[in-house]
Amino acid sequence: MQKVNDYMINSMQFLYLVASYLFGNILTAYIVTKWRHNVDIRDEGSGNPGARNMGRVYGKGYFVATFLGDAIKGAIVVSIAKYLFEDFTFVMLTLLAVIMGHIYPMLFKGKGGKGISTFIGGLIAFDYLIALTLVAVFIIFYLIFKGFTKPGLITIACLPLCMILYSYSIVTTILSALIIVLILYVNHE
């Protein structure tokens, strides 16, 4: 049985969590629309600075660019954490931090994206086998529901089960469940 001290974080980890949150504040949609059109995407379409709104307002190319930018952001945070700290529980905590930074960015007064792209990129970097398993789950639900939103949210909700199936610790699994609750909450609003 692990001791409570095993889950304490040191000052370097704390600084990395803060940096992860701040890195999450970089909103690809905002940067792209400011650069290309000199507008704030939060004033366009649904007002959400995410890939889906970019696709609706500016087309598929903007959707792809925004998705990739936000996904890479999550992947960078998780990849560096895996390299530096080698603790899956802490790495999952960094994924939560970057997603929190994306959804509730301090730089944008708490009005960010919905976190799905950042989550996907971070999850692929965390464990590509879990990501592939969830892709298979998504395909099954996509064939049943013939849409993206419902199958996507159902698939995301399956993450904690995958964490258990792939033998991650209970604490890491609980952190993954917190991420899912956050994403489902934000996407329900």
UniProtKB/Swiss-Prot annotation:
The keyword Amino-acid biosynthesis does not apply. SMART domains: G3P_acyltransf. GO terms for molecular function: acyl-phosphate glycerol-3-phosphate acyltransferase activity. Pfam families: G3P_acyltransf. One of its GO terms (cellular component) is plasma membrane. It comes from the Bacteria. Pathway: Lipid metabolism; phospholipid metabolism. The chain crosses the membrane at residues 12-32, 61-81, 88-108, 124-144, 164-184. It is an enzyme of class 2 (transferase). InterPro entries: G3P_acylTferase_PlsY. It is a multi-pass membrane protein. GO terms for biological process: phospholipid biosynthetic process. It catalyses: an acyl phosphate + sn-glycerol 3-phosphate = a 1-acyl-sn-glycero-3-phosphate + phosphate. Keywords: Cell membrane, Lipid biosynthesis, Lipid metabolism, Membrane, Phospholipid biosynthesis, Phospholipid metabolism, Transferase, Transmembrane, Transmembrane helix. It is found in: Cell membrane. Its EC number is 2.3.1.275. Probably interacts with PlsX. Catalyzes the transfer of an acyl group from acyl-phosphate (acyl-PO(4)) to glycerol-3-phosphate (G3P) to form lysophosphatidic acid (LPA). This enzyme utilizes acyl-phosphate as fatty acyl donor, but not acyl-CoA or acyl-ACP. Belongs to the PlsY family. This is Glycerol-3-phosphate acyltransferase 1.
